[in-house]
């Protein structure tokens, strides 16, 4: 797709500095700039790199700049770059229809313009919303509801009674609604706690590949609107996540934990059961949160066990000083031993 800088600027509400008739057909990342492309550059070093490349033009933020290359200036260059990715590389459109190998149960309702791919199983009583896409080898349980414009990728399993919102994306091999890991030790054995609940995924959620979200013991495990979940995440039974959370890979959230809105879990965070996390908390990578803790609004937590950032940094600095402190204590102990020996000698002389 060829587009002039003038047309691109109109698309992203930007301003061209230089020849706006120049056309480009592709975008480039700053670390692999293709000849004749449009490259997004942020920061002085990256802009210089782009200027010295074979790029046709540079997408930059606002500000006064002289450049030998044509520029498109925008208020938010990263947002503009996302819009241009969709413009130059639009997602493949799948024609609606039901593949002949799909198995559709009794009283299943398929909305308008739905695609059901090869070997998909939809059990009885489930509802699939308008314009939704179910790719191959998906299993949809009994009485599941899926909203409009939702895309589910291959090998996903959604258990009975789960509720999936609109504009949701679920990536390959994720499992929604499996039993929670609930057992109690009785009479010398682990007695399984039955799970009769379900999972609610609200609108505009994206869930990565190979993630598991367990159903509640009773009621619902909830993933709030706009939340984005990475690959390889475990969300346990009866967890309730607020709106617009970010959960990075290898994070595990144990049962009955609740979060507010706009909470960020960096990679490999471990949250124990019955934790309450208020709005806008940030948990740094590999943070560990003990059971029944209450994390305060807007606080950044680090370490294991989790501590507010300033406290965690002081603790880490103190730990790093332990070898020096031990060395100093050893030296002082040796000096005290020498002094005691001298005092013992003098005491004997006095006697």
Curated annotation (Swiss-Prot):
Pathway: Bacterial outer membrane biogenesis; LPS lipid A biosynthesis. HAMAP family: LpxD. It catalyses: a UDP-3-O-[(3R)-3-hydroxyacyl]-alpha-D-glucosamine + a (3R)-hydroxyacyl-[ACP] = a UDP-2-N,3-O-bis[(3R)-3-hydroxyacyl]-alpha-D-glucosamine + holo-[ACP] + H(+). Catalyzes the N-acylation of UDP-3-O-acylglucosamine using 3-hydroxyacyl-ACP as the acyl donor. Is involved in the biosynthesis of lipid A, a phosphorylated glycolipid that anchors the lipopolysaccharide to the outer membrane of the cell. Keywords: Acyltransferase, Lipid A biosynthesis, Lipid biosynthesis, Lipid metabolism, Repeat, Transferase. One of its GO terms (cellular component) is membrane. This is UDP-3-O-acylglucosamine N-acyltransferase 1. GO terms for molecular function: N-acyltransferase activity. Its EC number is 2.3.1.191. The keyword Isomerase does not apply. The active site is at residue 237. Pfam families: Hexapep, LpxD. Belongs to the transferase hexapeptide repeat family. LpxD subfamily. The keyword Metal-binding does not apply. Homotrimer. One of its GO terms (biological process) is lipid A biosynthetic process. CDD domains: LbH_LpxD. It comes from Legionella pneumophila (strain Lens).
């Amino acid at each position: 797709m060829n587009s002039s800088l003038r047309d691109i600027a109109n698309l992203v509400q930007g301003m061209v500095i230089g020849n706006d008739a120049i056309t480009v057909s592709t975008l480039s990342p700053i670390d692999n700039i293709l000849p004749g492309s449009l490259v997004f550059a942020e920061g002085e070093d990256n802009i210089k790199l782009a200027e010295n490349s074979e790029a046709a033009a540079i997408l930059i933020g606002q500000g006064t700049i002289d450049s030998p290359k044509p520029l498109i200036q925008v208020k938010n260059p990263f947002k503009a770059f996302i819009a241009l990715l969709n413009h130059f590389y639009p997602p493949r459109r799948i024609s609606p229809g039901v593949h002949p190998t799909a198995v559709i149960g009794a009283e299943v309702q398929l909305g308008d313009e739905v695609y059901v791919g090869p070997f998909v199983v939809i059990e009885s009583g489930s509802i699939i919303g308008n314009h939704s896409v179910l790719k191959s080898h998906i299993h949809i349980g009994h009485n599941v509801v899926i909203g409009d414009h939702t895309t589910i990728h291959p090998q996903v399993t959604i258990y009975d009674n789960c509720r999936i919102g609109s504009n949701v994306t679920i990536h390959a091999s994720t499992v929604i609604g499996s039993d929670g890991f609930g057992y109690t030790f009785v009479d010398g054995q682990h007695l399984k706690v039955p799970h009769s609940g379900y999972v609610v995924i609200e609108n505009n959620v994206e869930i990565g590949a190979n993630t598991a979200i367990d159903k509640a013991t009773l009621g619902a495990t909830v993933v709030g609107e706009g939340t984005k979940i990475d690959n390889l995440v475990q969300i346990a039974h009866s967890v309730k996540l607020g709106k617009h959370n970010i959960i990075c890979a290898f994070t595990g959230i144990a049962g009955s934990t609740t979060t507010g809105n706009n909470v960020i879990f960096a990679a490999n965070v471990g949250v124990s059961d019955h934790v309450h996390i208020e709005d806008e908390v940030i948990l740094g990578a590999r943070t560990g949160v003990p059971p029944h803790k209450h994390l305060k609004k807007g606080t950044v937590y680090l370490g294991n066990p989790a501590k507010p950032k300033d406290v965690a940094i002081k603790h880490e600095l103190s730990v790093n000083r332990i070898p020096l402190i031990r060395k100093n204590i050893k030296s002082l102990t040796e000096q005290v031993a020498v002094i005691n020996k001298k005092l013992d000698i003098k005491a004997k002389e006095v006697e």
